[in-house]
Each structure stands twice: as structure tokens, then as C-alpha cells.
Amino acid sequence: DVERSRGLGDVYKRQIYFGANLFVATVLVIFIGVLKIINSDLMKPTFNDLLDDWENPMTTTHLNYMMNPVIMVFDKLFDKLFPWLDKYDFDAAKLNEKIGFWGSRFAIGIYLGIFIGLISHQDIKSITTLAFMAATCLELFSIIGSWFIAAVEPLSQGVADFANKRLGGRMLNIGLDWPFLAGRAEIWAAANVLAPIMLLEALVLPGNGILPLGGIIAMGVTPALLVVTRGKIIRMIVIGAIELPLFLWAGTLSAPFITHTARALHASGIPATGLISSSTKEGPIEQFIAVLVGKASKGEMMMILYAALALIAYTALFFWYRHEMMKRNQKYSDEGKEVADDVKFVATHAAANSAD
């Protein structure tokens, strides 16, 4: 498990790796990029709600959140089949407090280091070194990300103010990386619970070839769960456990490409044998589609059919999700919150005219 080959660039390169020409790869990446931008606007009111700040300019086009449509399917099933579970939901901050150090990122890194050291038959000194290295890395992942977000937030606000002033009152959002939501305790509570679940799934899941390390704190998974469920921790954990196999399979599929690229670039620390990958790299669905499109580009009819069906299903699911998010945003607007007209059903000026 290696952190981290990222985003649309990775989708682009993987298509070419699996046979797509430059034009086909570019078209698919542009298509996914457009959906990401649409999604960033759809999520903006939910971000405002989660941050309890309806004037903040921040949103994100991060590929993490393209899992939202899949998560929303399960969220709607919860609404229909298990609505009573929400009565037993609990406060994520209190859960983190109860788990304490033994469920922290540092402790999880120690567990993983010891486990990997034992199964690789290393001596006590090597196991101890590995445990503390893994613990330190896991602890630093989120801290360094939060530093970056804090550093660019004033710049983002300044850019937004400047652009809004020059565009005659048109409001623009500023896209940041996902950690501007990292202050929500639900992200870390769900990640702490999902970590041992992911390790267990990795050991028993058919077709999986990854043992999670850096990705064990499921930062490619929990932010989207937070947005769709709006912090319902039981839903986040259950849906997260259901969708984790997608990430493990996608990481296994990506391993030859990532290892080939790392060796071609003469990256340090790449083993002569075996493969490296990431267990929770964002965009698993997009990875599968990229591989199908890449293989379809070679002209095989069956792969062309599979790629076409996958793209149709992917697009249909996204626009169903868009409809559901617009319903959510309309409720925010009906409650008096400021919501852009293009992400809800009833435009503000139209509602005002009908009231007159």
C-alpha cells in the first residue's frame, strides 16, 4: 500500500497504460472533470451545513466525492429499511474520546507495524522500528494536510472576493482539497472503526492482493460518507464497510500500473519483486471505467460493449444523485438558507415573483 497516485491524472495515465490513445483518454478525463465540477456545486450547501458557516467560499472538486452517488444508493436503502437505526446514533467526538489513544492513528500504525513485522518474520528490533515508523507516518498524514488547508484559506478567500467583485456580483466558490472538513469528528471516528474492518476484509476478500498500510486510515472513503449521510456515524460505518471492497479491488487492479510507473521513474524504495499500490486511493469506480475504456480502445467488441454500458450506468447514477442533492438543497433553501439557484429546483427570484 503506497500513498498516493492521485486524481484525474491517474485515471488519464491508467487509460493510456491499458491501451487508450491520447484523444480517448483526454475525452474521458474531461467528462469526469465536468462531473466533478457539477458535484462541487451540488455539495456546497451541505459543506456550509457541516461547517455551520453559510458564508464560507470553500468547496472541493476532489475525486473522493465522486463516490457520493454509490453511497447515496445505500443511504436511501437505510431510509427505507433501517430508519430506526438512526435512533441509536451517537456523538462522534465522544466515541473518539472513549476510544482514546488505543484507537488513535498513532496506535493503529503501531498495530499494523507489529502485524506486518510478525508475518514477515523480522526480529524484535526491526518490528519495533517498523511499528514506530508506521505510527509516525499515519499521524503526520492528516496533520500536514491540515497545515496546507490553513495556509491557503486566506488566499482562497482573497481570490474569491476579487473574482466576485470583478464579475458583477456573481459568486464563485473556491475549490480546496478535502481536509477543510477534517475538523469534523465523524471523519476520524468512522476511520478508526473502519481500520480493523478494512484489515479483516483485506485478508479474506477474494481477488484482493493488498495489505493496507498508509491507506488504513480511510481518507479516501470517509469524507464522502460524511457528506452524504451528514454525519450519521452508524450509516458511515456500515456503508463504509460495504464499499471498502471496491477500493481494495481497484488498488489491486492498479498495482501493475503503479509499480511499473514507479520503477520507470527510478523511485527509491521500490522492491525488486512484488507490487505496490494504495488500498483507499480515491476514485475506484473511475479506475474501473478507465481500464474498460482503455481496453475498448483496442477495438475488441466485447470490451467496447462493457465500456459503453459502464459509462451509461455511471452517468445515469450521477444524474439520479444530482436530483437527490437538488432535493436536499431545496430543503435548505426552504429553511431560509442561501443556496445558489442552479443547485435547487425553485429559483429564488421565481419564488419571490410567485409570492408577489
Task: Give residue spans per PLM region.
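Short juxtamembrane and helix-loop transition motifs at transmembrane-helix boundaries
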Residues: 89-97, 170-181, 195-207
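Single conserved hydrophobic/aromatic residue that forms the stacking wall/gate
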Residues: 1-15
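Long hydrophobic alpha-helical segments that form multi-pass transmembrane helix bundles
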Residues: 36-94, 269-277
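Transmembrane alpha-helical segments and their short flanking loops
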Residues: 47-60, 162-169, 212-356
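Accessory "access/gating" subregions that flank catalytic or transport cores
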Residues: 157-190, 194
